Amino acid sequence: MQQIRIHKNDKVMVIAGKDKGKIGKVLKVCHKHNRILVEKVNIVKRHVKPNPYRREHGGIIEKELPIVTSNLMIICSSCTSPTRVHYRYSESGKKLRICKKCNESL
């Protein structure tokens, strides 16, 4: 299984699919299924029945669904462009994520 280099609260851009070009913040990363939940991306409508025991109203609800990791690229905070990520170790031995374009730490 491929390593997921995108973490929670990262800013990402969709590079393939119906939401291509949209930018959002990562809400959740699912390593088991290789999918990522992104804010305001891949929105679908669900028809929900009312449930009086939980005090839920029925109706049509819009919610986000996870996207496959390969359809996303992380956005570098310094060069503000979508980029690939590689790793480098600092002098203290800490593992850092590095932008491939500008060589700055993410």
Swiss-Prot record:
Any one Pfam family match given in the protein's UniProt record, by short name: KOW
GO MF term set: rRNA binding; structural constituent of ribosome
Function: One of two assembly initiator proteins, it binds directly to the 5'-end of the 23S rRNA, where it nucleates assembly of the 50S subunit.
Gene Ontology, cellular component aspect: ribonucleoprotein complex; ribosome
Superkingdom assignment: Bacteria
Family affiliation: Belongs to the universal ribosomal protein uL24 family.
Keywords: Ribonucleoprotein, Ribosomal protein, RNA-binding, rRNA-binding
Organism of derivation: Lawsonia intracellularis (strain PHE/MN1-00)
Entries under InterPro entries matching the protein: KOW, Rib_uL2_dom2, Ribosomal_uL24, Ribosomal_uL24_CS, Ribosomal_uL24_KOW, Translation_prot_SH3-like_sf
HAMAP family in alphabetical order: Ribosomal_uL24_B
PROSITE patterns assigned to the protein according to its UniProt record, in alphabetical order: RIBOSOMAL_L24 (PS01108)
Assembly and binders: Part of the 50S ribosomal subunit.
Protein name: Large ribosomal subunit protein uL24
Record-level GO BP terms: translation
